């Protein structure tokens, strides 16, 4: 039997025009606080990670998932173009993997197109890679290997 490639639902990425306003809405509505606030120039976003689950549990912990709020640094970034075409909302779904390089090789072997052929830097020190939404029911999918 082959072990499942995906270890958990890691996060839902949500594109927003105003990161501060989105953070305030999630705090006031759901009581969620910011776990991490970063600017990722490679991906062209300012982002906030909000933990959903047991208080005090760290990245990669079972039972903890995240909401990742993404504000584009400019209109010509992937998230900026997404908002221009579709408006604010769900941008992608991220799944945890134990070994991102192995996961990419396995997925590529099935014929699924890779957006990223090699892992790159993600939130909170994770290694990440995206899979093409055209091969996955229209869902942009992110593989996430949390920082150990």
Residue ranges: model-predicted function:
Residues 22, 33, 58, 63-67, ...:
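Short loop/beta submotifs within extracellular cysteine-rich repeat domains
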Residues 9-16, 26, 50, 62-70, ...:
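Short, structured motif recognition centered on aromatic/hydrophobic residues
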Residues 40-56:
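C-terminal "cap" of GNAT-fold acetyltransferases
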Residues 1-45, 77:
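Long, hydrophobic N-terminal alpha-helical segment
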Residues 72-75, 146-148:
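A short, sequence-level motif marking secondary-structure junctions
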Residues 2-4, 17-23, 48-50, 58-62, 73-148:
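Vicinal oxygen chelate
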């Amino acid at each position: 039997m082959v072990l499942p490639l995906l270890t958990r639902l890691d996060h839902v990425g949500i594109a927003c025009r105003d990161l501060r306003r989105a953070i305030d809405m999630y705090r006031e509505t759901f009581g969620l606080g910011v776990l991490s606030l970063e600017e990722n120039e490679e991906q062209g976003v300012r982002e906030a990670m909000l933990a959903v689950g047991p208080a005090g549990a760290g990245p990669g912990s079972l039972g903890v998932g995240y909401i990742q709020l993404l504000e584009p640094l400019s209109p010509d970034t992937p998230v900026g173009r997404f908002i221009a075409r579709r408006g604010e909302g769900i941008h992608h779904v991220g799944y945890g993997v134990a070994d991102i390089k192995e996961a990419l090789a396995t997925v590529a072997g099935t014929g699924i197109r890779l957006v990223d052929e090699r892992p790159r830097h993600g939130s909170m020190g994770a290694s990440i890679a995206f899979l093409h939404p055209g091969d996955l029911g229209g869902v942009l999918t992110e593989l996430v290997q949390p920082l150990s």
